[in-house]
Design a protein with these regions (language model features):
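Cell-envelope and extracellular/periplasmic
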Residues: 1-199
């Protein structure tokens, strides 16, 4: 069994890890400062607007950075494919492989963007589809782990949107995907603090 792990932090599914095929989304939310209802737009994969989200009708000026929606996804997939292409380097005499599945434990950065949190489930569905296509693994399974600090019964706001999106994903893909509720086994602290060194 070969496990390929990408565990860079501070990345969101709604921006950095956004998979190919992801469209723009419009999300109605409330401006925290003014209390007014606003519509946020999330980018499509490799969108020409290189911002994580923006207010509808107010496209921001291009940023100085060259980052775009999905760039981390592209890099992660390319590095995994490179390992598989050179499999014999890591497993001498190995000539073929089968991608059996994917494990996803993420969501911390998406908590800080209402638009990303709202469409988390949609993005997760697209991620599963894209990964199966990328690795020519149409029957590969997926396991999604929730954020340890999020209690499914008491969660509110963006955390509730994300955990609900995760469970909706699991319900949609019964038999193909499963969701692991990690709150009962969490050892304290939170994802942005790496669970106090217990991540």
């Amino acid at each position: 069994v070969l496990i390929l792990k990408s565990s860079i932090g501070n990345r969101s599914l709604g921006w950095d890890l956004l998979p190919p095929g992801s469209p723009r989304h419009e999300v109605e939310t409330t401006n925290k400062k003014t209390g007014e209802k606003i519509t946020l737009v999330t980018p499509a994969h490799n969108d020409e607007v290189r911002h994580a989200s923006w207010t509808k009708g107010e496209v921001p000026a291009p940023p100085k950075h060259t980052w775009h929606a999905g760039l981390q996804y592209l890099g992660d997939v390319a590095r995994a494919k490179d390992v598989l292409k050179n499999l014999g380097k890591y497993y001498p005499d190995a000539t073929e492989y089968e991608v059996a599945g994917f494990l996803w434990w993420q969501g911390d950065k998406d908590r800080y963007n209402a638009a990303h949190a709202t469409v988390y489930g949609k993005n997760l569905n697209q991620l599963f589809k894209a990964l199966r296509e990328e690795f020519d693994a149409p029957k590969a399974k997926m396991v999604v782990a929730t954020l340890g600090q999020t209690n499914k019964d008491t969660a509110t706001g963006n955390e509730k949107l994300i955990i609900d999106g995760m469970f909706a994903f699991g319900d949609k893909h019964k038999g193909e995907a499963a969701v692991v509720y990690t709150n009962p086994i969490s050892m304290g602290s939170s994802s942005n603090a790496h669970y106090g060194g217990n991540a």
